[in-house]
A protein has these predicted regions:
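Membrane-interfacial amphipathic/re-entrant helices at transmembrane-helix boundaries
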Residues: 1-20, 48, 54-60, 131-136
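Membrane-embedded helix boundary and interhelical linker motif in transport proteins
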Residues: 28-83, 128, 237-238, 262
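Alpha-helical transmembrane segments within multi-pass membrane transporters and channels
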Residues: 57-96, 101, 146-147, 248-249, ...
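Helix-loop-helix "hairpin" substructures at the membrane interface of multi-pass membrane proteins
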Residues: 72, 135-215, 220
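Transmembrane helix-bundle core of multi-pass membrane transporters
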Residues: 87, 91, 98-158, 188, ...
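Loop-to-transmembrane alpha-helix initiation sites
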Residues: 87-89, 116, 138-143, 215-222, ...
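Cytosolic-side transmembrane-helix boundaries in multi-pass membrane proteins
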Residues: 170-177, 181-184, 256-310
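Transmembrane alpha-helical segments in multi-pass inner-membrane proteins
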Residues: 194-272
Length: 310
């Protein structure tokens, strides 16, 4: 097993997927909305990005994928804010509808081949030809996208609108009492979050030069696991620190995933690996809180035994 190759593969994929984790960070951690349309939105971004790239516009494909993500987030937000549908149910409805839309976007096919298509990655490779970064072109493109999104979040969430989004997630009743309508921050937050998800799908499609209808299946689980791992590894703090934690969590998850693949683990077992990682990530903070109490109980029992022996 080539360790360097393994780490590089994990890093490339984790950077692309961390855009979805950052989307979940905005919608789930900041806005307190559990958006289950992530899988469908990721595929939508991949499909739209692929079709526009095939038409000969790889850079425009990125904007188109993000725009498609905005529309997906807008519909999910409308279902929640204007129709009174619970966020979980709204996400499921949008995700279900997106399956048909994604097939339509892909021209009725469940698979798109982009082998002869110019992408942002092939353009980056040509641009870096002859330099020491020539072999790291995928890593560089993904890193630029992630840095741009992190900087945007760090700045945006400190603006008036960004603070309104955070306040809506913390306490919507307080926001209403402050004469602020929580509908608008919710809509904007979900639109921005889904734009990041669409971007993530687009970059993955252009990176692997193919799109299948199930490319986004399980993405919400992967993103949630990465988010929770990031929180465990870096903890709480500033927006910037937490956003970086999402990227670290995505890398840690993808590294475990890549190692499992390199160990020739059967493909059907990978979903179980994802589930176990999610459980461990959720349970770790709980056990951390319980550990001091457990130590006190053990100390009390030990002291009681000593008194009994005396």
């Amino acid at each position: 097993m080539n360790i360097l190759s393994l780490v590089q593969t994990a890093l490339e994929l984790s950077l692309i997927c961390s855009l979805t984790v950052l989307a979940l960070f905005l919608s789930y951690s900041m806005l307190n909305v559990c958006d289950l349309s992530t899988d469908g939105c990721f595929t939508l971004g991949a499909a739209v990005g692929a079709m526009v790239a095939i038409a000969g516009h790889p850079y425009l494909a990125i904007l188109a994928a993000m725009g498609a993500g905005v529309l997906s987030g807008f519909i999910a937000a409308l279902l929640q804010t204007k129709m009174g549908i619970d966020s979980l149910l709204a996400g499921i409805i949008v995700n279900t509808g997106l399956y048909s839309i994604n097939i339509a976007v892909m021209g009725g096919s469940s698979l798109l081949n982009m082998n002869k298509t110019e992408t942002v990655f092939t353009k980056a490779r040509a641009l870096l030809q002859g330099t020491f970064l020539a072999e790291q072109y995928k890593l560089l493109v993904a890193a630029i996208a992630v840095i741009a999104v992190i900087v945007f979040l760090a700045l945006f969430l400190h603006t008036r609108l960004g603070l309104a989004i955070r306040a809506t997630g913390d306490n919507p009743d307080m926001v209403r009492s402050s004469s602020i309508n929580p509908t608008f921050p919710t809509i904007v937050g979900l639109c921005v979050a889904n734009a990041f998800t669409g971007l993530s799908g687009c970059l993955l499609a252009q990176s692997q030069k193919s799109v299948s209808i199930d490319i986004g299946t399980g993405m919400v689980t992967i993103a949630l696991a990465s988010l929770l791992m990031g929180q465990v590894l870096l903890g709480k703090g500033s927006i910037l620190k937490r956003a970086i934690g999402m990227v670290v969590g995505a890398f840690a998850f993808r590294l475990v995933y890549t190692i499992a693949l390199r160990l020739d683990m059967p493909a059907f077992m990978l979903k179980l690996v994802s589930s176990v990682i999610v459980v461990l990530a959720i349970a770790t903070p709980y056990f951390k809180k319980q550990l001091p109490m457990l130590r006190r109980r053990m100390a009390a029992r030990k002291e009681a035994r000593l008194h009994a022996e005396d």
